C-alpha cells in the first residue's frame, strides 16, 4: 500500500520544506498559477505512478487541480493507495506546531470525510450556484 499525505491550508514552513511541491523548475513563483492545468494533472499523475509499495509521499499544495487529480487517481487505484489530507488553519500556522491540523479522509468515491468549511469545495459550490442548485 502506498500512502499520500496532502498538506494544505496554512502549511508550516518545515512541512513545505520537506514535502513535494509542484513549482516547475525555472518558473518564478509569480507565474506558477499560469501553469496549464493539463501539465499539473500530468505531473501529479506521473509522481503517483512512480511510487513504490510502502512509500509515503508528502505533498504540500493549495492547488485545486492537484487535489482533484489526487482524488481521482486514488479512486481509480483504491486497492493500492491510501490518502489523507492535513488542513492547517491560520491559527494552527501561528502555533508553529506541525502536529496541529485537521485530518480529512477520502471515501471510496473521492468524497471528503469530515472536511472543514470551505475545504476544496469552491468549484463544486460555484457550479451549484451557477446551476441554481443552491
What are the roles of these predicted feature ranges?
Residues 1-29, 45-49, 54, 65-134:
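RecA-like P-loop NTPase motor core
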Residues 32:
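C-terminal catalytic-base region of ester-bond hydrolases, centering on the histidine
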Residues 35-38:
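S-adenosylmethionine-dependent methyltransferases
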Residues 40-43:
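Intrinsically disordered, Ser/Thr/Pro-rich regulatory regions of eukaryotic transcription factors
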Residues 56-61:
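Structural recognition of the conserved hydrophobic beta-strand(s) that form the central parallel beta-sheet
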Amino acid at each position: 500500500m502506498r500512502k499520500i499525505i496532502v498538506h494544505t491550508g496554512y502549511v508550516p514552513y518545515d512541512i513545505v520544506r520537506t514535502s513535494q511541491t509542484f513549482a516547475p523548475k525555472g518558473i518564478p513563483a509569480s507565474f506558477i498559477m499560469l501553469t496549464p492545468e493539463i501539465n499539473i494533472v500530468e505531473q501529479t499523475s506521473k509522481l503517483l505512478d512512480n511510487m513504490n509499495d510502502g512509500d509515503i509521499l508528502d505533498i504540500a499544495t493549495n492547488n485545486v487541480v492537484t487535489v482533484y487529480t489526487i482524488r481521482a487517481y486514488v479512486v481509480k487505484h483504491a486497492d493500492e493507495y491510501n490518502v489523507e489530507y492535513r488542513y492547517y488553519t491560520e491559527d494552527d500556522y501561528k502555533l508553529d506546531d506541525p502536529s496541529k491540523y485537521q485530518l480529512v479522509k477520502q471515501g471510496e468515491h473521492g468524497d471528503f470525510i469530515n472536511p472543514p468549511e470551505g475545504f476544496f469545495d469552491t468549484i463544486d459550490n460555484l457550479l451549484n450556484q451557477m446551476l441554481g442548485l443552491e
